[in-house]
Amino acid sequence: MAATRVLTAATAVTQTTSCFLAKQAFTLPAKKSCGGFGGLCFSRRALVLKSKRPFSCSAIYNPQVKVQEEGPAESLDYRVFFLDGSGKKVSPWHDIPLTLGDGVFNFIVEIPKESKAKMEVATDEDFTPIKQDTKKGKLRYYPYNINWNYGLLPQTWEDPSHANSEVEGCFGDNDPVDVVEIGETQRKIGDILKIKPLAALAMIDEGELDWKIVAISLDDPKAHLVNDVEDVEKHFPGTLTAIRDWFRDYKIPDGKPANRFGLGDKPANKDYALKIIQETNESWAKLVKRSVDAGDLSLY
């Protein structure tokens, strides 16, 4: 029998049953800040792109989202589906809204901190449930626990046809943008958190660009203390280095080379992270509008 739990998810900007451009423009005031941890500096003036508004498609409005687990945990059949208030399956990737305004975003937990089962949204399955990743028919695990909550930003996509000129011309990894949430609480698979981005790391995995947005949940006791990359080093000393080193080295025990990082091997600041989020939201919008080839990706 499927197990079901109810989450209180953040609501969308406006109610909708079809694709729309949100009324609130995703813009930032002109300001310049630099990360104290050797962080890259990014001016908000440069964040004005062709499209200033976050794109959202069929974003759910009902704050009650049910998470339904099907199949035994840590099995090939295990899936975590998301249901709306009527019990209809929805996609955590496509139907949960990205932005809530005022620099706050929805974050969906795939892997709870202090666990090592490699969970991910199944981007090629209907309704994109969360499942455990496999290789050659076997379940995948990290060689050691991940020390932070890990998951995705909904309604984002790293376009594999787009070469990033700022990161060695690397192409996107064809997945939603990853988030590393540094709060103290261990979350559950499928939890939806309100987070604020703090920094970004440009990981290069076998030649593909795989952004890691460092963020914190708004309900964490230290959330009010951190607003940018330099605050992370002050209030979470050593965390940015630990995140970089963990993702650099986790494949080594399997005999693979270490991952690399662009942008001078340094974390970029909050403004740069927001730029990445906006750009990948625009890429996702092109995907769901079928302006680019979706390949095997599920669009519902």
UniProtKB/Swiss-Prot annotation:
Binding residue positions for diphosphate: R140
Superkingdom to which the source organism belongs: Eukaryota
Gene Ontology process terms (BP): phosphate-containing compound metabolic process
Activity regulation annotation text: Inhibited by NaF.
UniProt-annotated catalytic positions: Y142 (proton donor)
Entry annotated with the keyword Transit peptide: yes
Transit peptide stretch: 1-66
Summary of the tissues where the protein is detected: Expressed in all tissues tested. Highest expression in flowers, leaves and roots. Lower levels of expression in siliques, stems, ovary, stigma and pollen.
Compartments (UniProt record): Plastid, Chloroplast stroma
Induction: By glucose, frustose or sucrose at 300 mM, but not at 100 mM.
A cellular component term, taken from the record's GO annotations: chloroplast envelope
Coiled coil, from the record: none
Example of a GO MF term: magnesium ion binding
EC number(s) per entry: 3.6.1.1
InterPro entries: Pyrophosphatase, Pyrophosphatase_sf
Similarity comment: Belongs to the PPase family.
UniProt name for this protein: Soluble inorganic pyrophosphatase 6, chloroplastic
Organism in which the protein naturally occurs: Arabidopsis thaliana (Mouse-ear cress)
